[in-house]
């Protein structure tokens, strides 16, 4: 699991084979499903929370995007995407938070 953020980052720069990215994306999506993230978020449309593609677009080009999205996942908050607060996710391990944040910032790819 520790290679997922690295693999996604390399994929964004064009340095990783598609099959490795597909495996990492599938693992990240499974983690999102297991932790009920997909109850409030979808990849390309707003549900209760913002679409993952909108989150990726909002943070595109920001050097601290991974840290910001990771903090939002772990601590929750409100006001950034509307009035509905995102609950904190204190039970997620830091590595799981980074995996989810990297996947979201990559546009939550299936492959």
What is each residue range found by the language model?
Residues 24-43:
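Sequence/structural segment immediately N-terminal to covalent heme-attachment motifs in c-type
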Residues 58-68:
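Short microdomains enriched in Cys/His and/or Lys/Arg
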Residues 1-7:
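Positively charged n-region of N-terminal signal peptides that target proteins for export
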Residues 39, 45-59, 72-99:
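Axial heme c-ligation environment in periplasmic c-type cytochrome domains
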Residues 16-22:
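Sec/Tat signal peptide C-region and signal peptidase I cleavage site
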Residues 108-109:
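A residue-level marker of the well-folded mature domains of exported/periplasmic proteins
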Residues 7-15:
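Bacterial N-terminal signal peptides
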């Amino acid at each position: 699991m520790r290679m997922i953020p690295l693999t996604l980052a390399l994929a964004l720069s064009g340095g990783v084979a598609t099959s490795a990215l597909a495996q990492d994306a599938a693992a990240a999506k499974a983690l999102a499903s297991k932790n009920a993230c997909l109850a409030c978020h979808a990849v390309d449309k707003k549900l209760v929370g913002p679409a993952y593609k909108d989150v990726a677009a909002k943070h595109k080009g920001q050097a601290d995007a991974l840290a910001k999205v990771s903090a939002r996942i772990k601590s929750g908050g409100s006001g950034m995407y509307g009035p509905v607060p995102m609950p904190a996710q204190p039970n997620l391990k830091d590595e799981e938070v980074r995996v989810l944040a990297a996947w979201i910032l990559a546009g939550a790819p299936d492959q």
